[in-house]
């Protein structure tokens, strides 16, 4: 699960304008990074333009998924990730960054034209959400629940195995008890015929 970029765009008034972006292309070779970065910026703008206000959508392109949330207030957020990244976490991140961006940068700052704004929190969110299980409480609880369930299954299996071993031990004890009674009876018979006077 990997996040490649997080972008905030101005959707209204058109044309779409990239306000700020953060990307992590370290998983690509040095020579591929610039072309992949350009591709992601181009595709981010294209997907944002084609998403209606108030809607969310996911667009797959090659090995990437672009998660888009175009809000009714003129802001649009786009996340580029791999196909394994969970949808719920992606949209949680989009809501969070768009709300925080709007709080720190009122509409008057970005609605009037081609501006690029500084929003260093994007880099923080990009690194924090690389591991969605650590960033998302529900996923973290689900992971802990799965781990607990695995431990519980192993414990139950070992208890059942011990129970089977106890059953075997009881059976052997019964067999030994039966054999010792038979030995006692045969020894008593043999001793009864050989009385020394």
Curated annotation (Swiss-Prot):
Domain (v-SNARE coiled-coil homology): give its ranges.
137-197
Q: Which InterPro entries match?
A: Longin-like_dom_sf, Longin_dom, R-SNARE_YKT6, Synaptobrevin-like, V_SNARE_CC
* Lipid attachment site numbers (S-farnesyl cysteine): 194
Molecular function (GO) terms for this protein are: SNAP receptor activity
The similarity annotation says:
Belongs to the synaptobrevin family.
Residue list for modification Cysteine methyl ester:
194
Which residue range or ranges hold the Longin domain? 7-126
Keywords associated with the record: Cell membrane, Coiled coil, Lipoprotein, Membrane, Methylation, Palmitate, Prenylation
> Is Coiled coil tagged as a keyword?
yes
SMART domains of this UniProt entry? Longin (SM01270)
- Gene Ontology biological process terms in this record: endoplasmic reticulum to Golgi vesicle-mediated transport; intracellular protein transport
Q: Residues with S-palmitoyl cysteine lipidation?
A: 193
Q: Which residues form the propeptide?
A: 195-197
Q: Do you know which CDD domains this protein is assigned to? A: Longin, R-SNARE_YKT6
* The keyword Cell membrane is assigned to this record: yes
Q: Which Gene3D superfamilies match?
A: 1.20.5.110, Longin domain (3.30.450.50)
Q: Name one Pfam family in it.
A: Synaptobrevin
Intracellular or extracellular location(s) = Cell membrane
Q: Name one GO cellular component term.
A: endomembrane system
The record describes its membrane topology as: Lipid-anchor
Which superkingdom does the taxonomy of this entry point to? Eukaryota
Which SUPFAM superfamilies does the record match to this protein?
A: SNARE fusion complex, SNARE-like
Protein's recorded name:
Synaptobrevin homolog ykt6
